[in-house]
Amino acid sequence: MSKFTKYFLMEASDVIAYVKEKLSKFEHAKGLKCKEIGDGNLNYVFRVWDKKENMSVIVKQAGDTARISDEFKLSTNRIRIESDVLQLENELAPGLVPKVYLFDSVMNCCVMEDLSNHTILRTALINHQIFPQLADDLTTFMVNTLLLTSDVVMNHKEKKELVKNYINPELCEITEDLVYSEPFTNHNKRNELFPLNEGWIREHIYSDKELRMEVAKRKFSFMTNAQALLHGDLHTGSVFVRDDSTKVIDPEFAFYGPMGYDVGNVMANLMFAWVNADATMPPGAEKDTYMDWLQTTMVEVIDLFKKKFLDAWDIHVTEIMAKEEGFNEVYLQSVLEDTAAVTGLELIRRIVGLAKVKDITCIENEEARARAEQICLKVAKSFILRANQYRTGRSFVETLKEQSMHYAE
């Protein structure tokens, strides 16, 4: 009798038994091994492999609380959302997400392609690796998954069915708290401030009423603007890379929201990589080459996104009023404003809030870390307060470089 007819959190030995029962190609495998490899905040991730037979899979299971904190009570439905979204994204952006082999609504888990021959992008960037096709792949992914799930392209009734299918209240609440509220109010007393910057943050983040007003506006846009199906957590820890391949993973935060949320997350996390390199690499040609590539990548993320977005609009638009001359540019500009604001929000929340990024925390020299944080926080305020001024990739990068040089003076 199967032991997998009632939900429980699996251990490695359970996962081996699970794949042997559920996946025919593993049924008679003799040398299966399993290791829990998850380092995220929410789920349990296992790699199962048979070296002799050269086959492997990933098993991802959802618990009913977040790993980051038991305070976050979560619906295990998020794994259903993730499985569904990955399959949809594979239709919209083929080859840019892992394949899903199985979803199990009883065990609240899914089985998917093993990407062990790739590296987590955040880790690769901290190690100062270069991936020439990164911007091209990420912009293709974002344009195809965002524009093609919007009212511009989809039948409106079908789009509303997707909105209903991807209602994701528990994970949206995490974003509403950790991105749009707590970094500016600390009302839940969970913020973690680096001591050298604590005074500056209290004066220039917590006490800035103009900033808080702009964040309030963006929060309500996030909660009410069901523009497109977002990945919802598109940082560099949600991307696997190798020289010839990019794979976007972990869309468990997916829901219908403003497109710029995904684009802004990508931009902010590339900036974390930039300040990390600025703080940790010794001066010289290697540092110059790497930081130049990061700057070019940031420029291309915005500029390629714009070009591909308008090209895809011309090909796929179905909404009659969206065909009005010039409306595509107006629509795109609103996406870019959201992008700038979210870039700022992500920069602030990862420094002030509960969920840190290794790009910052691994900077061992305290003065260098304080400098990196302040560069991020200062450019973040500009992105939020002057979001309508950021229309090109170069405008983002110039603000980052100017703040870095200003800090050095």
Swiss-Prot record:
GO biological process, one term: toxic metabolite repair
Keywords: ATP-binding, Carbohydrate metabolism, Kinase, Nucleotide-binding, Transferase
Disulfide bonding pattern of the chain: none
Residues involved in substrate binding: 233, 349
Statement: the UniProt record of this protein carries the keyword Aminoacyl-tRNA synthetase: no
Pathway in which the depicted protein is active: Carbohydrate degradation
Catalysed reaction, written as an equation: 5-deoxy-D-ribose + ATP = 5-deoxy-alpha-D-ribose 1-phosphate + ADP + H(+); 5-(methylsulfanyl)-D-ribose + ATP = 5-(methylsulfanyl)-alpha-D-ribose 1-phosphate + ADP + H(+)
Keyword check for Acetylation: no
Domain of life of the native organism: Bacteria
GO MF terms held by the record: ATP binding; carbohydrate kinase activity; S-methyl-5-thioribose kinase activity
Residues that, per the record, bind ATP: 43, 60, 113-115, 250-252
Residue stretches spanning the membrane: none
EC number: 2.7.1.-, 2.7.1.100
Quaternary data: Homodimer.
Family of the protein in this entry: Belongs to the methylthioribose kinase family.
NCBIfam families reported in the protein's UniProt record: MTRK
Function: Catalyzes the ATP-dependent phosphorylation of 5-deoxyribose into 5-deoxy-alpha-D-ribose 1-phosphate, as part of a 5-deoxyribose salvage pathway that recycles this toxic radical SAM enzyme by-product to mainstream metabolites. Is also able to catalyze the phosphorylation of 5-methylthioribose into methylthioribose 1-phosphate, but this enzyme may not function in methionine salvage in B.thuringiensis since it exists a paralog (MtnK) present in the methionine salvage pathway cluster. Does not act on 5-deoxyribulose, 2-deoxyribose, ribose, fucose, fructose, fructose 6-phosphate, and glucose.
Protein name per the record: 5-deoxyribose kinase
Organism encoding this protein: Bacillus thuringiensis serovar kurstaki (strain ATCC 35866 / NRRL B-4488 / HD73)
Taxonomic placement: Bacteria, Bacillati, Bacillota, Bacilli, Bacillales
Encoding gene per record: drdK
